[in-house]
Amino acid sequence: MPPFIPKSRSNAVESVYLHGWVRDMLLESKTSQNIAVIPRVDPDEASIPLLSRRIYANRRHFVKITKFFQVHNYSVYASVKDSQHQILSQFTPKCVSEFESRNRSRITSDTVNTLFMIGDAKLGIMVVDELRHYFGEKIVSLFNGLDMPYIPYLIINQAFILDYDQVEAFKMTPFVYQYI
């Protein structure tokens, strides 16, 4: 007999900070590249983000890291998610350096499924061959059959840990690319 899930539990959320924004962001910026999509976070506000109305008001500041793919020339290539979709991303060398000196640990060390606050991010695009190089063949296979010559990804220049709990997703979160 399958487990009984009460109606109140069927809409459970992983975090009150995660909201669906990735798909809308991509639809808004479909015609442009290298545009700023997430504003910079003042480091003083980042130390107590829950008291900052400016940070909390922008849903795009909050993501979870779902997987790390590769480190290349001090950039870290990963996938991040909101409450509904995943998107490929690059943590820039500046972001990685600042994160690691502030936290005294590697950005890739025990941070999968950790809630992050990000800032100073823009949207970039990559051709499939570049994608294969940075994210691997498995990711490229996701784009077979999609009519997308360029794949958008998030370029993140600021990252702060908001919550160290590594709560796994209740359900599989799909990549956003088939929905745009």
From Swiss-Prot:
<dbReference type="GO" id="GO:0007004">
    <property type="term" value="P:telomere maintenance via telomerase"/>
</dbReference>
<dbReference type="GO" id="GO:0033677">
    <property type="term" value="F:DNA/RNA helicase activity"/>
</dbReference>
<dbReference type="Pfam" id="PF10341">
    <property type="entry name" value="TPP1"/>
</dbReference>
<dbReference type="GO" id="GO:0005697">
    <property type="term" value="C:telomerase holoenzyme complex"/>
</dbReference>
<keyword id="KW-0158">Chromosome</keyword>
<comment type="subunit">
    <text>Component of the telomerase complex.</text>
</comment>
<dbReference type="InterPro" id="IPR019437">
    <property type="entry name" value="TPP1/Est3"/>
</dbReference>
<keyword id="KW-0539">Nucleus</keyword>
<comment type="similarity">
    <text>Belongs to the EST3 family.</text>
</comment>
<dbReference type="GO" id="GO:0000781">
    <property type="term" value="C:chromosome, telomeric region"/>
</dbReference>
<keyword id="KW-0779">Telomere</keyword>
<comment type="function">
    <text>Component of the telomerase complex involved in telomere replication. Stimulates RNA/DNA heteroduplex unwinding which favors the telomere replication by the telomerase.</text>
</comment>
<dbReference type="GO" id="GO:0042162">
    <property type="term" value="F:telomeric DNA binding"/>
</dbReference>
<dbReference type="GO" id="GO:0003924">
    <property type="term" value="F:GTPase activity"/>
</dbReference>
<protein>
    <recommendedName>
        <fullName>Telomere replication protein EST3</fullName>
    </recommendedName>
</protein>
